């Protein structure tokens, strides 16, 4: 039996659940921008939460429970229980909450958890928000309005903390190669040249950067790669992305294939679909959420986890990627975005 043979089948929700409000902060770099210097995690979470409340036409007195997501709050914020520190900011003092952290999957699990609480009938209105401040880190014993830049050594420790370190398993999860393992398999399985892989990854970088430059909430990415190329005396984005400014950091990965670190937060509010039209004329019904955990000690872990989660929702809803009008994918690594699109048909 492989670890894929034991995947449970999703069951329909006990009652339908819909999103009635969404909110987000601008995505900033606190230490680089004097206009937001001194902002802290609580303010960012509250900004997104209040924005979602405003979108739904509710306030903290209406929301019954909130969920706080942050990937690794111990290293960026020196907070062990960050959910405890935002209730006063959003008008929910005394109400229930909890915190969760699942690295790149934190946002997805935040949606799943909020939906489960409402679908079960335990609560009628739940807010779920996620906040990240990875561009800088807090001091261990100072107020959180004072921050500092991390070092490469600190970030290496953080990345190592995402790996299984049982006995010799740690040696099988070396970054960034654990993220490239599925891509290398895909390339060899389909007889793709390294030049074609590079062209695909470069095009993804260019398109993602262009989308970020157009996004009004992005305050950190104002220039496309074409503009950066011109600024540095180069003729094209392709030339810039194959220069010293974008070195290889793996077999296929370059610097631009990795995330752009910034500070920000986003939130949603969910309630039973039967109540949703009381708050909005365009609720977003959630049909199902797949979930699979495959840690980096397993070869091609991202590929198997994505396949598993997609298979769950496909079997539950009868829908495939071909039925979708819009498809959004995690692009913490470019190859993750490509993997999701390939897997979800």
Model-predicted regions and their roles:
Residues 2-42, 156-165, 169, 188-192, ...:
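Condensing-enzyme catalytic core mediating Claisen C-C bond formation in acyl metabolism
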Residues 13, 73-129, 133-177, 228, ...:
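Conserved catalytic cysteine-centered active-site region
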């Amino acid at each position: 039996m492989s670890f894929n043979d034991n995947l449970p089948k999703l069951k329909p929700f006990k009652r339908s659940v819909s999103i009635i409000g969404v909110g987000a902060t601008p995505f900033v770099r606190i230490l680089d921008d004097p206009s937001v210097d001194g902002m802290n995690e609580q303010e960012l979470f509250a900004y997104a939460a209040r924005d979602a409340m405003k979108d739904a036409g509710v306030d903290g007195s209406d929301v019954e429970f909130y969920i706080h997501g942050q990937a690794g709050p111990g290293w960026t914020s020196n907070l062990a229980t960050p959910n405890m520190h935002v209730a006063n900011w959003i008008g929910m003092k005394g109400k229930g909450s909890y915190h969760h952290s699942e690295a790149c999957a934190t946002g997805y699990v935040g949606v799943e958890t909020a939906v489960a609480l409402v679908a079960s009938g335990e609560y009628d209105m739940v807010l779920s928000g996620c906040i990240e401040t990875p561009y800088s880190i807090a001091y261990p014993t100072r107020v959180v309005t004072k921050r500092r830049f991390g070092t490469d050594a600190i970030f290496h420790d953080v990345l190592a903390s995402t790996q299984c370190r049982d006995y010799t398993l740690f040696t099988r999860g070396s970054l960034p190669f654990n993220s490239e393992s599925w891509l290398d398999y895909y390339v060899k399985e389909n007889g793709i040249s390294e030049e074609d892989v590079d062209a695909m990854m470069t095009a993804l970088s260019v398109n993602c950067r262009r989308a970020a430059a157009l996004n009004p909430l992005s305050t950190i990415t104002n220039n496309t790669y074409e503009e950066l190329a011109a600024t540095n005396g180069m003729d094209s984005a392709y030339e810039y992305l194959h220069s010293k400014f974008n070195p290889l950091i793996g077999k296929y990965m370059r610097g631009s294939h990795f995330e752009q670190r910034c500070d920000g937060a986003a939130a949603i509010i969910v309630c039973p679909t039967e109540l949703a039209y009381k708050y909005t004329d365009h609720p977003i019904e959630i049909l199902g959420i797949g979930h699979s955990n495959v840690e980096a000690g397993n070869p091609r872990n991202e590929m198997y986890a994505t396949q598993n989660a997609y298979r769950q929702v496909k079997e539950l809803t009868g829908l495939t990627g071909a039925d979708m009008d819009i498809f959004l994918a995690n692009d913490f690594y470019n190859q993750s975005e490509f993997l999701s699109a390939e897997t979800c048909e």
